[in-house]
Regions:
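His/Met- and acidic-residue-enriched segments that coordinate or traffic transition-metal cofactors
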Residues: 2-6, 11-204
Length: 204
């Protein structure tokens, strides 16, 4: 009788163990079944690819691009500053009109260049160089016909220089957007040169 009881208990224990093992296996299987499958063929995108941007744009600029961008930024600032002087200080209607045109057109070009720089991740200069500052200070100190002669002389010489620099960038630049800026701005500069020569001829 005692042996029979022990046998029954042993059978119950074994049956219980098998049931627990079966439950554990089923739970493990369910967990695997409900997990999302991993597709190893899907590409893994980095942050640059997701955003569609890269931090290498500015470093990819050629020395020609950088030199042009810097010169155009400083030259554009000077044209606006001198144009403001002409519009406010000159008593010659032609010279005043020339100054207004410089402020408007170069202000627009400066904004376009700043937008390009922001997109390219390039830092433009925010002040005139020493030579440009001296030219501005000298012009600011002049009055009347002397001012008009100095201003129109500067506009003729500066725009000849600007046109040469913009043509060089359009031909030799590497960055497409900056080359396009140079090409599309050239007709405006050529018009400025023509108007500057007319204004210079009107000054007595």
């Amino acid at each position: 009788m005692k042996n029979s009881i022990l046998t029954i208990l042993a059978v119950c224990v074994i049956a219980g163990c098998k049931k627990n093992e079966s439950t554990a296996v089923n739970q493990s299987t369910d967990t695997v079944a409900t997990s999302a499958p991993v597709d190893s063929s899907r590409p893994i995108l980095d942050s640059a690819a997701i955003s569609g941007t890269t931090s290498d744009t500015a470093t990819d600029l050629s020395s020609q691009d950088k030199q042009f961008a810097d010169a155009a930024a400083k030259g554009g600032m000077m044209e606006v500053m001198m144009g403001q002087l002409a519009a406010g200080n000159s008593t010659n209607a032609t010279v005043k009109s020339l100054g207004d045109m410089m402020v408007k057109d170069h202000g627009k070009a400066n904004d376009e260049l700043k937008k390009w720089a922001s997109t390219a991740g390039y830092t433009l200069p925010t002040a005139l160089n020493a030579d440009q500052q001296k030219k501005y200070d000298d012009l600011k100190s002049k009055k009347g016909a002397e001012f008009d002669r100095s201003y129109t002389d500067l506009m003729v010489s500066d725009h000849k220089k600007d046109i040469a620099e913009f043509k060089k960038e359009a031909a030799e630049g590497k960055e497409a957007s900056l080359k396009s800026f140079a090409s599309t701005t050239l007709p405006t500069l050529e018009h400025h040169l023509m108007e500057s020569e007319k204004a210079k001829a009107s000054v007595k």
